[in-house]
Regions:
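Hydrophobic alpha-helical transmembrane segments
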Residues: 32-42, 61, 65, 126-131
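Internal/C-terminal transmembrane anchor helices
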Residues: 109-134
Length: 346
């Protein structure tokens, strides 16, 4: 609903959940009232008068995004027509059945009550079937809504325990983390399914549906003059500014980590951070991994706890020669670390 209203109003209005729920409920009830006036079904088939309202509700919740500024229905155009045709036939049968004798029992256990309950259950299933049930899209819309409210902590809690993600969701989480100044500390606690070319909307490979891109660019320092790769955009920002924007620095460093470019990461991190134990966690993990992988590293990083933890990871991997089994065991203990992302998350 939020996405549909934003697109249809071209960003001029925002969907208010409480007001929208009340308004939609009243509108659907009014439709049912009108339908009942023209098709006065009673007793066993009364619930059929709710089908047009429920069908409209399903259509309203079935929209899917197309790019950054348009939507479309997530089902074929003929589906509602076919459903209405079946409904019309059922109403004919229901009108004829009203003249037939029925169970005189009135109340919870009457036959008409249970038949109507069954019909309403089927209508609810119809709405659920028609509606957009894409979990990742719902996460994206909730995060963008939280960003519009300036609630970055709330945005970062959305879908945190889920393994489902996409490039747009990763981009939104990176931005929320950047606003908190914790990208280097928490990014790989989430499933990262993008690469550096998708971590910003500068090249249109990832899109924002509701949150204005201008707000993101203002935070980073400038709007790109043309389409360009995010890393190129960040490098231009760094060259322009005499004082390095910490968010720009973290975006570049995390871009290298996402692409598994440890050499570039190791060469760049010294420009932004003092190499010591106070580095953000994922940067310490990356430098530890880099030091162990390279025979002649440009940066040698050792930290007792981190070295012990990495050695334990290597010992754990040696116990399981089969990749699938090894991945499962490592995931149990190391999911949320850069080490797990680098070696196992594709």
């Amino acid at each position: 609903m939020m996405m549909a209203q934003h697109v249809l109003s071209q960003g001029m209005t925002r969907y208010q959940p409480l007001f929208g729920t009340v308004l939609i409920t009243l509108a659907l009830w009014a439709i049912q009232f009108v339908v009942y006036a023209f098709v006065p079904l009673t007793m066993r088939s009364h619930a059929l008068t709710y089908l047009p309202s429920m069908l409209l509700l399903g259509m309203m919740s079935a929209v899917v995004p197309v790019g950054a500024d348009s939507i479309e229905m997530g089902f074929s155009w003929y589906a509602p027509i076919l459903i209405l045709l079946v409904w019309w036939l059922l109403t004919r049968v229901g009108r004829l059945a009203q003249g037939v004798e029925y169970d005189k029992v009135i109340g919870l256990f009457s036959q008409p009550m249970w038949i109507n309950a069954l019909i309403m259950s089927l209508l609810i299933i119809l709405v659920a079937w028609m509606g957009n049930s894409n979990a990742v899209l719902h996460y994206r819309m909730k995060i963008e809504h939280a960003l519009l409210d300036g609630q970055f902590d709330r945005a970062l809690k959305v879908g945190k325990k889920s393994l489902e993600s996409d490039a747009d969701l990763t981009m939104l989480r990176m931005y929320a983390l950047a606003r908190k100044g914790t990208m280097g500390e928490h990014l790989f606690e989430y499933p990262v399914t993008a690469n550096s070319s998708q971590m910003l909307p500068t090249d249109s490979l990832s899109v924002l549906m509701m949150y204005p891109a201008d707000s993101l660019y203002k935070f980073l320092g400038a709007r790109p003059a043309e389409r360009m790769e995010p890393m190129r955009y960040l490098q231009l920002l760094e060259r322009r500014d005499s004082v390095i924007n910490p968010a720009v620095a973290d975006y570049q460093l995390c871009g290298y980590l996402i692409d598994r470019q440890l050499d570039k990461f190791a060469s760049a991190i010294g420009r932004y951070y003092t190499i010591n134990d106070s580095l953000p966690r994922h940067y310490r993990e990356a430098l530890t991994l880099y030091t162990h992988l390279k025979s002649r590293p440009v940066v040698v990083y050792h930290q007792t706890v981190m070295d012990v933890d990495y050695n334990n990871l290597q010992e754990l991997e040696k116990k399981y020669p089969l990749f699938s089994e090894r991945k499962g065991k490592v995931e149990e203990q190391y999911r949320g670390t850069y080490w797990y992302y680098y070696k196992y998350q594709k």
